[in-house]
């Protein structure tokens, strides 16, 4: 990132109770710090890699976000590749915290 002030507000939110029905992310989506109409996108990091550097970036719900082309460009610049989740039949896109914002029109990845 460049030094200096960001051109936008940046919010880092840690939510809880995903397994209990997305309670934390639903609460934030209903009570956002910045109106959702002004929210340009979000990144959900649900599980972090503890095994070291990898070449792939796994997208949950491939094809469901207009942020994917940007992610693909950034990944390519790092010598990485974007891949879809290995088991889409599990419906993880609809059971993860990003869905609370995505269903309200916020581009999420």
Residue ranges, per PLM feature:
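Metal-dependent peptidase/peptidase-like ectodomains
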Residues: 5, 15-109
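Flexible, small-residue-rich helix->loop connector segments that border functional cores
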Residues: 1-7
